[in-house]
Amino acid sequence: MIKVYSDFDVYLESLAIGDADSIAANANDRDVARGVGMSHFPHPYGRSDAMAFIEYATIMFAQGKEAHFGIHLSDGTLVGVLGISSLDRENRRCEIGYWIGKKYWRNGYGRDAVRLLLRFGFESLSLNRIEAIVFDFNDVSKKLLLGLGFESEGLMKEYAAEGDAYIDGELFAMLKKNYKDTARIVVDGFNPELFGQR
């Protein structure tokens, strides 16, 4: 079990079966699903969907391919999920994605969670480049990434399907040399062997 924390209002912890009900309760919202991408995020979202995702995340982590975390408040309440995918060890890059339950929006939890994940990616995984793709309508997420030092690298026309229409995506990236966060962030329980580190 990995835990990533600081003195922030949230901490990250590896997903576990006990998170299923909280994930389902927070994910079962059309606006949350739309922000993630409805082509691979079901709506409605039930406990069985959460269980399937936790199982998938556990397998991908064991194979050293992805790392997904619950975003928890200091009292343990799970408010969202974020993770690393498209992990390219040879080129030391990945893509991140995240969502927060709607009732927890606009509290800074997403920002702090991404800060924790950046430290994990750049230091624990020795990545050089971290990317995020944000749908064109998601101005809040764009602002979050820009505020953390990500740079926009361009618009991807008709990036994702939404019903019979297509949504543009915007690519954001941060390079390790531009990473400036000096907060004291602790990573407990991580085994770098799982991710092919030397």
Kindly label every feature range from the protein language model:
Residues M1-D31, H68, L73-R198:
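Acyl-donor (CoA/ACP) binding surface of acyl/acetyltransferases
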Residues A27, V36, F61-A62:
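Hydrophobic residues in alpha-helical segments
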Residues A33-Y56:
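Conserved GNAT-fold acetyl-CoA-binding loop/helix
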Residues E55-G70:
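A short helix-loop-beta-strand connector motif used in the catalytic cores of GNAT acetyltransferases and
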